[in-house]
């Protein structure tokens, strides 16, 4: 069975469109400043699955793949480099920070806007100490042709959100330095 030239071209184009257009995001946010205060405790970091919202306010963003593992590694790397806590890992620590992240893509004035929302709960054992919410936006290009057109603003918005979150946590340092697990009476 021999395929016509038109069919071959169509199948090739279909393969390229279905595989070549997905922007696989890799981020490595870096702290822009040293911590305002340090907390001499170990920190366990856990993340919920990433939520994505596209320009049409529906779940998911067309042609964008941001693996949970990459987001986790990006946040862990940022927290380790910042140096607020004595150690940061996914293993049990003195404190536990659970983060839920959401990326919202919108289009305004012919430019894409990338908003990262972080909801974080700080715990000591199973007891909630404090919750945090931060939202930061970075402006991208007018078109999403290449992966970098998504990656750069996503990384910038994530970095700003992490800076804001850590600033709030560092401001509350006395909560975490003085907090001890209370035994049930």
Where are these regions (language model features)?
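A structural "domain/chain start" motif
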Residues: 2, 20-73, 174-185
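Sec-dependent bacterial lipoprotein signal peptides
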Residues: 1-19
């Amino acid at each position: 069975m021999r395929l016509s030239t038109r069919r071959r071209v169509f199948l090739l184009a279909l393969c390229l469109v279905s595989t070549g257009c997905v922007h696989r995001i890799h981020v490595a946010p870096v702290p822009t400043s040293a911590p305002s205060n340090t907390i001499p405790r170990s920190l366990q970091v856990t993340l919920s699955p990433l939520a994505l919202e596209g320009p049409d306010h529906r779940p998911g963003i067309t042609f964008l793949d941001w693996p949970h593992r990459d987001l986790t590694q990006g946040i862990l790397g940022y927290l380790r480099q910042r140096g607020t806590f004595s150690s940061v890992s996914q293993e049990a620590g003195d404190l536990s920070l659970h983060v839920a992240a959401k990326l919202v893509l919108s289009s305004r004035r012919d430019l894409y806007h990338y908003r990262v929302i972080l909801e974080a709960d700080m715990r000591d054992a199973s007891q909630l100490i404090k919750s945090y919410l931060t939202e930061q936006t970075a402006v991208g290009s007018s078109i999403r042709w290449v992966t970098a057109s998504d990656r750069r603003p996503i990384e910038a918005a994530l970095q700003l959100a992490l800076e804001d979150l850590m600033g709030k946590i560092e401001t509350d340092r006395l909560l975490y330095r003085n907090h001890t697990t209370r035994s049930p009476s």
